[in-house]
């Protein structure tokens, strides 16, 4: 009976700790090239970190993939890494310290301040692009292959990433803040790897959840009309 209680308590502790990680975190670092802003977003199973110039939005670095927590040890499996593609498919483990508003990576000596805990945005979690409409015709795409376009959202932050886990290729990323109010999804772009001049751009879309999928309609950062379909990543 005591062993059962201990096991239950350990499971409950791990679940509580994992739920505490979910959301968005940030830190700043002063380097020779200027002030860097670093943001990491955690959903229940997936995470992504972005690093960019805090003043200009110039993109610097990103990596991400899956994560799990065992006690205070976090293990991440890398799905993309803009600085070192050979890390794709590998796992890295490290000790963390967590409280309500601070996440510390012990060996790295880095401390992150909480931005949000996964609220209040309606779309928090990990999504994969699963289709789009072209000239009114719906086109679907597989989400179980190595080529992925993933969008990771906390309660207030978003990041999209296009990559291939098989070839280890990184195709692009962008991110910033978002809000969802009365069926309107608004983005404030803070970085965009393909074109740094997009930083500061504000975009507005209509959104609707249909059969569990996120329908995303409006105009792209290039001004082209779009209607994308995103499915929750499991």
Per-segment meaning from a language model:
Residues 18-173, 184-234:
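Lipid interaction determinants
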Residues 175-181:
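Beta-propeller blade signature
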Residues 1-24:
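Bacterial Sec-dependent N-terminal signal peptides
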């Amino acid at each position: 009976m005591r062993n059962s209680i201990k096991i239950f308590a350990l499971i409950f502790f791990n679940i509580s700790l994992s739920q505490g990680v979910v959301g968005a975190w940030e830190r700043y670092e002063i380097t020779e090239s200027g002030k860097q802003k670093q943001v990491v977003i955690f959903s229940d199973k997936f995470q992504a970190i972005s690093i960019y110039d805090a003043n200009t939005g110039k993109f610097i670095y990103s990596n991400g993939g899956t994560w799990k927590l065992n006690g205070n040890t976090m293990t991440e499996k890398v799905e993309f890494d803009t600085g070192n593609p050979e890390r794709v498919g590998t796992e890295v483990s490290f000790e963390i310290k967590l409280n309500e508003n601070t996440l510390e990576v012990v060996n790295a000596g880095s401390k992150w301040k909480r931005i949000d805990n996964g609220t209040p945005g309606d779309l928090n979690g990990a999504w994969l692009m699963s289709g789009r409409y072209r000239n009114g015709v719906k086109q679907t795409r597989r989400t179980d292959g190595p080529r992925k376009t993933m969008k990771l959202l906390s309660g207030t932050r978003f990041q999209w990433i296009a990559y291939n886990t098989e070839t280890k290729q990184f195709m692009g990323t962008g991110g910033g803040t978002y809000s969802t109010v009365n069926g309107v999804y608004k983005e404030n772009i803070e970085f965009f790897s393909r074109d740094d001049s997009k930083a500061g751009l504000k975009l507005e879309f209509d959104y609707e959840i249909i059969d569990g999928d996120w329908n995303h309609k409006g105009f792209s950062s290039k001004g082209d009309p779009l209607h994308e379909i995103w499915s929750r990543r499991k």
